[in-house]
């Protein structure tokens, strides 16, 4: 449906983003089929932002590092995607991060070593997770660390969960009152979006 809707517009007038979400079927064949189907369904010859989805995740059989290896390295899919970027079929290649800090650090170490250049990284960031994500859930990593590591390398950040699943748009009444006192014309949600957008290097 997205491809049909966008067909009426010039391709240069918008950006497309999609992902390699091969969590359950990560053979080379299944993964390349997923990539090719994205091009077909979006009715395009190239994708502006392509992500390796859920780096840092795990499943019942694999620890995070093992799953990353199985989904993207052992099956040659990362090399396949790098070649697609070289051909111009992918304009920007990155990953979305969920979970284990060691996996995040490992992915950036590949960038540091010249094995892969990440054009962008998608991280969870909002004014609560900036300093308290790990405190709330030990499995999470504070956004200040994630963003800081990307900034050190000049890698742009794409933000997910700027409203923390909508919770930052539904604050307690005393907090809302203070925000409205400061800027009556702004919505509660706008404070969260402004927070993320005010950081350097956020796409």
Language-model segments: what does each one mean?
Residues 2, 31, 35, 74-77, ...:
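Aromatic/hydrophobic pocket-lining residues that form the small-molecule binding cavity
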Residues 3-4, 36, 105, 194:
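Active-site phosphate/pyrophosphate- and oxyanion-stabilizing loops and adjacent acidic/basic residues
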Residues 31-50, 83-87:
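CE4/NodB-like, metal-dependent polysaccharide N-deacetylase domain
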Residues 23-26, 99:
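Glycine-/small-residue-rich active-site loops that bind phosphorylated ligands and cofactors
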Residues 1-14, 45, 80-86:
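N-terminal binding-site loop/beta-alpha segment at the start of enzyme catalytic domains
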Residues 12-14, 45-49, 91-92, 117:
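Short acidic capping loops at alpha-helix termini that bridge into adjacent secondary structure
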Residues 12-24, 50-53, 123-125:
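A short, structured active-site edge motif that brings together acidic residues
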Residues 55-203:
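Beta/alpha (TIM)-barrel catalytic core signal, keyed to glycine-rich beta->alpha loops juxtaposed to Asp/Glu
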């Amino acid at each position: 449906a997205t491809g049909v809707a966008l067909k009426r517009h010039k391709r240069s007038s918008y950006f497309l983003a999609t992902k390699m979400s091969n969590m359950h079927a990560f053979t080379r064949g299944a993964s390349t089929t997923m990539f090719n189907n994205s091009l077909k369904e979006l009715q395009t010859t190239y994708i502006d932002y392509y992500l390796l989805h859920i780096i840092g995740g795990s499943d019942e059989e694999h620890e995070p590092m093992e799953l990353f290896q199985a989904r993207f390295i052992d099956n040659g899919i990362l090399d396949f995607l790098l070649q697609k970027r070289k051909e111009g079929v992918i304009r920007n290649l990155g990953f979305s991060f969920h979970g284990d800090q060691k996996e995040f650090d490992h992915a950036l170490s590949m960038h540091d070593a010249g094995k892969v250049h990440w054009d962008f990284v998608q991280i969870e960031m909002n004014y609560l997770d900036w300093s308290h994500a790990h405190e709330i859930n030990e499995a999470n990593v504070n956004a200040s660390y994630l963003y800081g590591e990307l900034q050190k390398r000049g890698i742009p950040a794409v933000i997910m969960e700027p409203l923390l699943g909508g919770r930052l748009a539904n604050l307690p009444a005393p907090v809302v009152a203070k925000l409205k006192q400061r800027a009556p014309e702004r919505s509660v949600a706008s404070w969260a979006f402004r927070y993320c957008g005010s950081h350097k290097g956020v796409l």
